[in-house]
């Protein structure tokens, strides 16, 4: 089964477009793993505890650790919400709150 991936609002797209082509290729590689692999290794995709169904896509380069927050809409759609450079051990709460808010907005938009 192929997973469809879409970005909601502009946060992910703005971040992606601001990266150089090498980083963009790394992001695309990891998103392709999510899209095509039946079981994505946890080093690339992890459910975040104590959240409203938010997942963290992990893109690791030699100089940066990039996180893309997302959620599932049904069994075959991943919705990307926001993206950031991870600088600490824990995922910043403000980024999680933003992803949860965008998820709520997405569901309202979808159902209206």
Where are these regions (language model features)?
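Basic, Lys/Arg-enriched alpha-helical interface segments
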Residues: 1-65, 74-78, 87-112
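ATP-dependent carboxylate-activation loops
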Residues: 81
């Amino acid at each position: 089964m192929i997973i469809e991936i879409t970005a909601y609002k502009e946060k992910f797209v703005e971040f992606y477009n601001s990266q150089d082509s090498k980083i963009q290729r790394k992001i695309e590689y990891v998103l392709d793993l999510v899209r095509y692999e039946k079981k994505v290794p946890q080093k690339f995709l992890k459910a975040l505890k104590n959240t409203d169904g938010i997942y963290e896509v992990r893109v690791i380069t030699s100089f940066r650790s990039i996180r893309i927050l997302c959620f599932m809409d049904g069994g075959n759609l991943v919705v990307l919400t926001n993206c950031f450079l991870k600088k600490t051990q824990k995922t910043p709460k403000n980024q999680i709150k933003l992803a949860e808010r965008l998820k709520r907005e997405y569901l309202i938009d979808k159902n209206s």
